[in-house]
């Protein structure tokens, strides 16, 4: 009788956790199979408020949860069993912490008496994520512990949280109830008697007010700030921050808007998108050096040239706008940081600058680069930059674009074309790893089923082959474009002492193709080596209701040689 009560109480705690998380805004739960997490798994299986996603590999599962949280702007729960299953979430948790994405890890664990004694699949799980998650350690379920304690613990940890939380859940055996019938949270249960009111509504047990403390400058401070030559820089911004408001701000003040690949504005016709290249254009750089005021929205800039410009310029006034308290400036410039939403800050009572339109010539230089890229990329030899520009120019309404790390995101930042219709853009640029990129894109695609394109390098895809299994489950378009240049060819751009060292220790050529991997997971596959075939396959893939793979075969040195040639032309402009 006692063991059956243990199984029932375990399950009841699991159900209380999942129900309260749903009330706290969780929409998705990502689950990997395992025995010690059974109370959570069975509770999730009966929870109708959550959409369930299952995958056998915890590393990919964590990144899928990351993508779901990015796309939904809501916390996502992850259920794993004990042991190294939890450790496999670490890369995704690091990325989520650095980019303020709320993931909630629910890890099944052995009870205290089975830790540190050689029991199977038992490791020290509390604080396993070190500095990258808020830690909550729940005791083993006990009838003497009031259910209200469990709910208030969850509420305090999760409400208004913008970063990962690790909730470690210890369970004693038996884990499996003898039967699953009826509702787990039965209002007739004596244990749940203190929660009768809670059971009758759909609100969290404890309701926390929003803890936002937004800051903004006075009208007088704004007037002084805009009195001079300035630039506005759009760094990493999420779609819900409504970055379009920065266009109106730029036009009102009369300062140029310089845009990063992650700003949602990189291709906007009213922005200066080619800033990375303009900073090596002699006339443009000389003009930009006249600026003495800068207004930066967001951080984590891609362009090293833009980062260097911010570091080297002698700024009279440097303002940065961030949604949370953060330090996002590797150059450590003296500045005033305002905690605010980008759109709200852009809609303050701004005045026209006394030096409005001081940098209008940048538009001419930006247009010159556009023409240069059309001639030498779009009409040039087939390669990675040409494919990326073709993707950026071919977008259905409401498309989502996930750009992989290493070379793809840099090529987009350097050479993306101007377009009046741009996709919602996502990246993983917190830790900037090349792992979990396909899984993240699958999570983004799965949330609302919008057509999604992933641009990913060959080594990144080799890192995440398991996630083809997640892609296979999608029922909306996900086009996986693999830029296969046979290794880590971003190292062609770095000052490795000689070619032999570059080849043997950095580039790691593999000679592999992805056709059989796609076939293993029953994914439609095409391999292309020219622009016409790519465009035909890409349009077809966008109409396919599921995931498909396009492998783009390019030579090892094509991208680096093209970048070098373009750099030379820009410098000679």
From Swiss-Prot:
CDD domains in the cross-refs: TPP_PYR_MenD, TPP_SHCHC_synthase
Catalytic activity: isochorismate + 2-oxoglutarate + H(+) = 5-enolpyruvoyl-6-hydroxy-2-succinyl-cyclohex-3-ene-1-carboxylate + CO2
GO MF entry, a single one: thiamine pyrophosphate binding
UniProt record, GO biological process: menaquinone biosynthetic process
Keywords: Magnesium, Manganese, Menaquinone biosynthesis, Metal-binding, Thiamine pyrophosphate, Transferase
Pathway: Quinol/quinone metabolism; 1,4-dihydroxy-2-naphthoate biosynthesis; 1,4-dihydroxy-2-naphthoate from chorismate: step 2/7; Quinol/quinone metabolism; menaquinone biosynthesis
E.C. code: 2.2.1.9
Note accompanying the cofactor annotation: Binds 1 thiamine pyrophosphate per subunit.
Cofactors that this protein relies on: Mg(2+); Mn(2+); thiamine diphosphate
Domain of life: Bacteria
Family designation: Belongs to the TPP enzyme family. MenD subfamily.
Protein task: Catalyzes the thiamine diphosphate-dependent decarboxylation of 2-oxoglutarate and the subsequent addition of the resulting succinic semialdehyde-thiamine pyrophosphate anion to isochorismate to yield 2-succinyl-5-enolpyruvyl-6-hydroxy-3-cyclohexene-1-carboxylate (SEPHCHC).
Stated name of the protein: 2-succinyl-5-enolpyruvyl-6-hydroxy-3-cyclohexene-1-carboxylate synthase
